[in-house]
């Protein structure tokens, strides 16, 4: 797991990808590369809920400078908000025009029923058509799962009907099973100013950090460590490990910082999310 600190998010991202030698992981320059941000709702990234467009710009520039051209940004906002509005408000419409890449609204996509390790789930066809998937989640809290990062961000690649179904089944098991088919090839985590309490933002905690990883299970295990949770408190992580998605053995993680952090950030041991979670009554919510 690599990390970098600073304020120039685009250049930080490019340096992080150079350090990770991302281009050596992509099999062919003709590969269709999908970039999956978190645009849960139409709110600017500074609010603490959505992926900073500067990070996506850094990924696109890094790839285009190495002659990768077949790229697409794909996402589906949560039920109740329109992805098209999120693309506009979050700066992705202008980003796509600037770099000449396609935007795919997975809320409007066709789907295929897939066998996800014994669980049938509807998955968007645009995601299934990818050769290489770069996941760009926001490190933040969640009122039901405590944390949301790499594994849960794949939920934006299923239709709204399936999102509701996830909640009817209980989030943890379907999130884990989804990741047996939607395999993340590389992860760039927006740890700039995520809301550590709620998935829709409003209380951003400025950390000015970006992470990179290849294993979504190990990535989310590290996120639990950062936010003072035990891995067992986020059941989908261990379920995903048992399904062969990745490793939750944090003792095997190799952490490397690309630069020094100028200011330390205190993460409270007890936060609002812990108090709220027990009071949440889930009725087909879809975040």
Report the location of each language-model feature.
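N-terminal and secondary-structure boundary signal
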Residues: 1-287
């Amino acid at each position: 797991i690599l990390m970098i600190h600073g304020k120039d998010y685009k250049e930080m991202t490019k340096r992080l990808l150079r350090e990770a030698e991302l281009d050596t992981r992509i099999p062919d320059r003709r590969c269709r590369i999908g970039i999956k941000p978190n645009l849960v709702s139409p709110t600017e990234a500074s609010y603490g809920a959505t992926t900073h467009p500067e990070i996506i710009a850094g990924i696109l520039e890094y790839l285009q400078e190495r002659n990768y051209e077949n790229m697409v940004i794909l996402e589906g906002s949560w039920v109740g908000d329109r992805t098209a509005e999120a693309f506009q408000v979050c700066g992705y419409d202008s980003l796509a025009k600037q770099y000449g890449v396609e935007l795919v609204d997975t809320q409007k996509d066709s789907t295929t029923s897939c066998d996800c390790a014994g669980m049938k789930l509807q998955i968007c066809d645009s995601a299934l058509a990818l050769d290489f998937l770069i996941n760009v989640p926001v490190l933040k809290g969640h009122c039901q799962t405590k944390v949301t990062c790499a594994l849960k961000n794949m939920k934006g690649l299923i239709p709204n009907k399936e999102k509701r179904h996830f909640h009817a089944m209980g989030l943890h098991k379907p999130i884990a099973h989804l990741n047996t088919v939607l395999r993340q090839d590389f992860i760039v985590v927006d740890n700039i100013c995520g809301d550590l309490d709620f998935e829709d933002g409003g209380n951003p905690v400025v950390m000015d950090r970006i992470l990179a990883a290849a294993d979504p299970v190990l990535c989310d295990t590290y996120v639990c460590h950062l936010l003072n949770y035990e891995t067992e408190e986020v059941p989908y992580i261990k379920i995903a490990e048992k399904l062969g998605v990745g490793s939750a053995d944090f003792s095997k993680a190799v952490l490397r910082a690309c630069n020094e952090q100028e200011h330390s950030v205190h993460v409270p041991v007890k936060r609002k999310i812990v108090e709220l979670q027990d009071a949440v009554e889930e009725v087909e919510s879809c975040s």
